[in-house]
């Protein structure tokens, strides 16, 4: 029995409110949702259960150390091998993982989107296509004010 081909991996990076999610969701629409798995880097913020909530709120979530790169790399390897992965669900109110997971199924195309997805070398080297969304800083600021 032939094995499924390795998925095409796309990394979509850019500043906060640059349009990463919009581009990624549009890709899903164009390819058909059943052919694309979307993973958000925000799901891989390190857990901060050991810290008081006031301390968690002060953490720099735009720093590379804020992410669990090892887990994300493991999940991409599993998806490439045809396995489903339990992606953590991040709780923005409590600044830590919720304890829930969202099962992501293997797909022909896997998109990983987030501010620093092109930062980590092992992750960056996995991508078949790397996209950087360059949006004017003033526009991103306005979008962030509207969103948050």
Residue ranges, per PLM feature:
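Phosphate-binding P-loop
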Residues: 2-7
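Conserved lysine of the Walker
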Residues: 20
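Post-Walker A alpha-helix
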Residues: 23-24
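P-loop (Walker A) phosphate-binding loop of NTP-binding proteins
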Residues: 15
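ATP-dependent NMP and nucleoside kinases share a basic, alpha-helical "lid"
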Residues: 98-148
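Short, structured coil segments at secondary-structure junctions
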Residues: 32-34, 126-127
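Conserved nucleotide-sensing/catalytic segment adjacent to the nucleotide-binding pocket
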Residues: 34-40, 46-94
